[in-house]
Amino acid sequence: MAEHTDQNLLHQVIYSVFVRNHTKEGTFRALEGDLDRLKGLGADIIWLMPIHPIGSEGRKGTLGSPYAIQDYRGINPEYGTREDFIHLVDAIHARGMKCIIDVVYNHTSPDSVLAHTHPEWFFHDEQGRPSRHVADWWDVVDLDYTHKELWRYQIDTLKMWAEIVDGFRCDVASSVPLDFWTAARQEVETVRPGCIWLAESVHGLHVLGLRKMGAYCATDTELYRAFD
């Protein structure tokens, strides 16, 4: 655990919600109608899987994966509007629960906002094409965190969302430099004191495989320094 982790988090119950599948309507407004039940189950923290627009290029299936994000600063219109999202978070807070959202900072969809505006911020293969380190993830391209301008953009984005939500669940956190997460945590704290940071770590064999390819990947014993 990070040096400043709130020990009360050890006793908190986190309930993960995939907005698309949680209700028949698959919207923020419809999810509000189920919050009392989730509270009754003992949930303390509602973790929303990615709420952002999904890319079209290379999409898996008809609907696409929510982890192939097209715009980190946007809201998936299938779920509702930004105002609907804020209304949902307010409703979660009104019931004494907290809300965290998924952030997917290892990769974006191939047709993402960043792919169009900053193609230099991405990992490229030997042919100079935007690519990925995990072959099966063909609906995404990996970001390259050797670019400090990318750090600034991502941290500013986290600070933007931290004005609304209580924390973040960080997808494939192991593949994003630990120094980035440490810097992000420090800056976000100025916006959301006590912000919750939950990391997805990966199996040791996955770490080893990526490192053999020359890619960055942190172990559990490294990640704990930046996450709760």
For the regions a protein language model found, what residue spans apply to each?
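A structural motif
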Residues: 43, 165-167, 213-215
